Each structure stands twice: as structure tokens, then as C-alpha cells.
Amino acid sequence: MNRTDGLVQRRRVVNSSSGSGLGQDGSNDISHNDKLSGHGMDTDCTMQKDLNSNPKIDESQDSDKETRLTLMEEVLLLGLKDKEGYTSFWNDCISSGLRGCILAELGFRGRVELEKAGMRKKGLLVRKLLLKNDAPTGDVLLDEALKHLKETDPPETVPSWIEYLSGETWNPLKLRYQLKNVRERLAKNLVEKGVLTTEKQNFLLFDMTTHPLTDNLAKSRLVKKIQEAVLSRWVNDAGRMDRRTLALVILAHAADVLENAFAPLSDDDYELAMRRVRTLLDLDFEAEAAKPNANPVLWAVFAAFTK
């Protein structure tokens, strides 16, 4: 693998662009200043901890004093330029990637489940996503997605929901399920948590709200967690990895922001990290989902981005 033909070259192109922003989340997602009625703190931490705990390897055991971020917030934080405070204009994967994170987060919190494979052994991509618990999570985006899931009958598949929530469906009746201004709303969450700040930048003909990084430690911890997962703490067994970290690696790759975490690595470590990421992407997701204590929702989300 020639790093200069991949990561470095792409980063130069990205850094040279200035016409990007947070609001490009679907064809109708163009407003950068959408005002939210409020962001509640996560009131579901206990359930989340129980669902994500792994007795073999728990990479979050030292995170009690750290800022708690959702999977969506972590992926967005990876994609944001630290000083500029916006995502790359050239990244057309982050929109759907963030919607996948939303479904995975709902799976972590026990709000959704995948229908049983049954006697016909249905594959992950055709099994329906079912509402398991419609209790509010305390997160505006998650609760909005839950509301859409509750209103939909018959249930839909995970790939369909990623399309609906992204607004990338050809079915006009499903456009009402689009989650709008996702990047801006997640950025505001990170502002409230003290990770980002809010500024106005002028781009020739228009002003744009940006969210530069203020908590460098939070970003450093996130990058370190990803690097260690595929380097010093690599276990070569997805079943032994912390589930949330596994989801972060795969969905950051789906959102095309994973390489941002590998930028500081040496060439040798970079190539090793990318080989191990490829190992995860090449797993038999159907077999992994069938293992005891597996969360089929997660594997269905992963499969939706690697089909």
C-alpha cells in the first residue's frame, strides 16, 4: 500500500477546499442554522453500559471521567477539521454513515432489534428492524428516529432505514423520514459538552456557522482509542473486541473519516492498521451475528455498508 497515493494525497485535496460545511446531510438538508428546542443529556447510561459491557476486553473502563459521546458524535468529531470546524466538502459518505451510527446506537441501547432469521435463515440485509422499546433516550436525534420507527408499519430493513433517514430514497412517501441537519445538530451537542465551540466564517458570498475544536484532549482520546484497537490492543477476534469500539472503527470507515485517525501514524503502522481494518470488513457478518451474545442489529448495519 502506497500511503502517499492514498491518505496524504486526499488530505491535501481536502485541506485546500473551503466551500464545505456541516449541513450537507441529504438532498434537502441545506440549513446550517436550524434551532433545536433543546438537547437532553443521556438518561439511559445504565442500560447502555449493561448492553456494551464485554467481560473479555472493555476498552472504555477508564472513561468514567471522560466526556461521554454517542457513536454519531464520535464519527462527526473524526470528520471535522480541528481549526476550521467543518467537514470535507468532498466527503459524500458521512451523511449515510451518521445514519448508520444512529441505528447502531439504538441497538446498543436496546431500543431496536432484528427479526429472527427463522427456518429460512434470512440474511441480515432482508431481516426487518423491529422496535423493541420506545422509551425516550434523552437524545433528540435518537428519539426522532425512534418516532419514525414506531410510525412505520410494516417494518423495514436496516438498509432501507439508512436510505430513509438520509433522504436518499426514490420513494416520495418515505421522504418524511429524513433526519435533517444531522451534522449541525450533532455539532451543537458537542458544543454543549464543551468539545467544540461555535464561530461564524465568511466564504465570499455567504456566512457559515462552523464549530472548531476546543477540547483537544477529547479528540486525542478518540484517535488513540481507534489506533490502539487495531494496533497495540488488536486481538484478531471481533468477538473479543469492545462492541462500541468495533462499531466506531467500521462505521468511521463507512463514513470515510477513519483515515483521519491514522494520519499521525508511521507508514508501517498505517499499513498495519489498514490491513487489520480490512480484516474486520472481510468478516462473515452473518456468522458473527449468529454467535452467542452477538447484537444482530450492529452486524446488519455493518453489512449495509459493505454489501
Task: Show which residues each predicted segment covers.
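Non-catalytic, well-ordered alpha-helical scaffold segments
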Residues: 73, 100, 104, 184, ...
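Glycine-rich, aromatic-bearing surface loops/beta-hairpins
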Residues: 212, 216-307
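Short, amphipathic alpha-helical interface elements at domain boundaries
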Residues: 2-178, 282-307
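Short glycine-centered helix-capping/turn motifs at secondary-structure transition points
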Residues: 110, 194, 253-256
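Short, amphipathic alpha-helical interaction segments positioned at domain boundaries
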Residues: 127-171, 178-185, 189-192, 204-246, ...
